[in-house]
């Protein structure tokens, strides 16, 4: 049960598709390093993953009593993590200008609250929408942009 809770915490800390891709690449580096270096699992994890993910993965290893160099068991946990992360649903949002990381997290949290599930955002900056947001998810398209409003109604 604790493993699932920690895995959920890890997934919840991934907000964007870019973060997911970077995280999966880092997990691959960690996994390969397990068997090609003499560093400890703790050292490898701390070097391969950035915060907060390194802390969460180390906690998963610790919960399974794996910090004593059981590299095959660590690899199994890393596979579990990769599988869970790859299963995460993503959606594309288009905004008119660069938004802050805090704004991205707030938008993601709003979708989390509305949809009751973790969703990764692929944020695209598209100045042609002028303002607002355009959402693509599972074949669904919702256009809440100023450009769409002007197109429909002729003015703002």
Which stretches of residues belong to each language-model region?
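Elongated, mostly alpha-helical coiled-coil "stalk/stator" tethers of large membrane protein machines
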Residues: 1-130, 134-156
